[in-house]
């Protein structure tokens, strides 16, 4: 009876000692929300539906690079019109993400355009559509039958100046 009691106590002690180790490990590797600020990987969410990805380089009038902000994604809706004014507004937001209220957009590169690439189910091949940036703008097409989250990409140089 004594051997059985000692064996039971030994197993019980081992069980408790391992549970305290595993609790410490899980507590130390838990996610600490206080360490992350808005915009870090912890707060990134993939946009649902179409989005405009703005990836620009800010240059001065002589084409010298002033600012290279990170890219920013903005949700857009099919059927809405993206004019030059709206696109400049999005570009200014992208600039503000790096240097808040320091720069303003003077002009977009004349060759700037917005592109979207997707697999066309009807043609059974990859398609790339380009849309010029004009005052009149273009209507965002509904590509939901081909792709779930189409990314409309603006990758260009933008002439900027200090505010």
From Swiss-Prot:
The keyword Signal applies. Keywords: Plasminogen activation, Secreted, Signal. Residues 1-27 form the signal peptide. Transmembrane segments: none annotated. Gene3D superfamilies: 3.10.20.130. It comes from the Viruses. One of its GO terms (cellular component) is extracellular region. Pfam families: Staphylokinase. The keyword Signal applies. Its main location: secreted. It is found in: Secreted. Potent plasminogen activator that converts plasminogen into plasmin. It forms a 1:1 complex with plasmin, which in turn activates other plasminogen molecules. Belongs to the staphylokinase family. This is Staphylokinase. It comes from Staphylococcus phage 42D (Bacteriophage P42D). The lineage of its organism: Viruses, Duplodnaviria, Heunggongvirae, Uroviricota, Caudoviricetes.
């Amino acid at each position: 009876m004594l051997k059985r009691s000692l064996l039971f106590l030994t197993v019980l002690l081992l069980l408790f000692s391992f549970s305290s180790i595993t609790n410490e490990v899980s507590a130390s590797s838990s996610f600490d929300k206080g360490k992350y600020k808005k915009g870090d990987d912890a707060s990134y969410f993939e946009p649902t539906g179409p989005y405009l990805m703005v990836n620009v380089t800010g240059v001065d009038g002589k084409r010298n690079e002033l600012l290279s902000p990170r890219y920013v994604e903005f949700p857009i809706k099919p059927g809405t019109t993206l004019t030059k004014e709206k696109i400049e507004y999005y570009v200014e937001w992208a600039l503000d993400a790096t240097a808040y209220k320091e720069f303003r957009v003077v002009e977009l590169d004349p060759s700037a355009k917005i592109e979207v690439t997707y697999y066309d189910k009807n043609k059974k091949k990859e398609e790339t559509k380009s849309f010029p940036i004009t005052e009149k703008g273009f209507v965002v097409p509904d590509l939901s039958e081909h792709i779930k989250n189409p990314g409309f990409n603006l990758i260009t140089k933008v002439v900027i100046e200090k505010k």
